[in-house]
């Protein structure tokens, strides 16, 4: 075990000894969804590796990405709250205190944070025996059996896209009827419900805007990335990526390879509102796996972004042509993030780049 994980385990044990069980909040009225806390959990000091972090790392300059995947179900549940602990320097003690007012915890776990996250889930369950706990994120998508066997505090885990699985549970649907989840039944036997169909383009347009939840629950001045203007806001206009690169996180553990796009009208409307909500923001970042993979759609979106006078950047393909680049530049694009993984043809072949 890494030394830093040992340190987190020690802190958990200390918390077990010092925390007294806190009283539960009042039960919600009939017909209301479970009062839900969405959590990107506390992590190692200055480590950006939790919810939605594409490049987990501890950097010389403290920096964090937004927990965008948690914003969509958070925006669909009345009374919910999104807590992004690392950039806001919220401790586990503070998280546990917050949970006294909630009935359901949705925690976005990561491979590097797994040991600490499962230990804290067990402590939370000891403190609030009635609370329901679901884990989402890469390690539970790839190894659901291991997750459920190692962490006895879990009520269930979600595999891959979890937006509607979480909503259905919070609104009272029985576990055995919810697609895309795994759980232990009353006999302790792990049950894997059938996979949930990927969210459709039409559903993407109907979902809440991530930037609205940022404005509701987060302090955007806490977020910074060295290569972007500060403060910045990141969001997605698509899900999925048709490329088969073996090293990429989200297509393989969350969004899959089917490329689905929001309408350009929906994206432009969100950006117009975001500019009004965040006058202090210097730059927007489209964190799509490959923002400009479809020329016609990229140019159409740029035509709608151009009147807004935004500064923005994105992930890009090296094969982007001149016409597309010109449209992007005229619409306010400042920077392209392009992957140069190797100069060795065999390595590129091996990683399916």
Predicted regions mapped to residue ranges:
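Acidic, low-complexity intrinsically disordered segments
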Residues: 2-270
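Radical SAM [4Fe-4S] cluster-binding motif and immediate context
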Residues: 210-353
